[in-house]
Amino acid sequence: MKIKRQIVVFDAPDLAAESTFWAGLLGGTVVADDDWHSVLVDGVWQLGVQLAPNHVPPDWPDGTPQQIHLDLHVDDLKAAHEEAISLGARLLKPADDLEAAEGFQVYADLAGHPFCLCWG
């Protein structure tokens, strides 16, 4: 089997808010259709957001319902944190040690999907 394209797709009740959040965080743009938005970075499709009016966000860290999450590796955690928060992310779990050589912080996007900003 040859996979031609691999895309992460998030369910969200508000397509515009969710796709704008991810486009802002990834430095991309949104291409909008009626019930689907695509997020492109440098013209390349990075992820999709599909309309799910009854979307229920996971109850992190319990994971009910269990959902995928993204690990986004960054060079500057402080700058990435500030950008994520300014776009509407919520910090769910701060890093145990910001001075450690590697680590992560857990956030939720506007629809409640967890993601991590990682370093090291």
Per-region residue spans from a language model:
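Core segments of cupin and vicinal oxygen chelate
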Residues: 2-3, 9-52, 86, 92-102
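A broad, low-specificity signal marking well-ordered, structured residues that form hydrophobic/aromatic
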Residues: 37, 47, 68, 105, ...
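Short, charged/polar, Gly/Pro-enriched secondary-structure boundary elements
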Residues: 44-48, 56-57, 113-115
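A cross-family glycoside hydrolase active-site/sugar-binding cleft signature
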Residues: 50, 71, 118
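Short, compact, well-ordered microdomains
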Residues: 81, 90-118
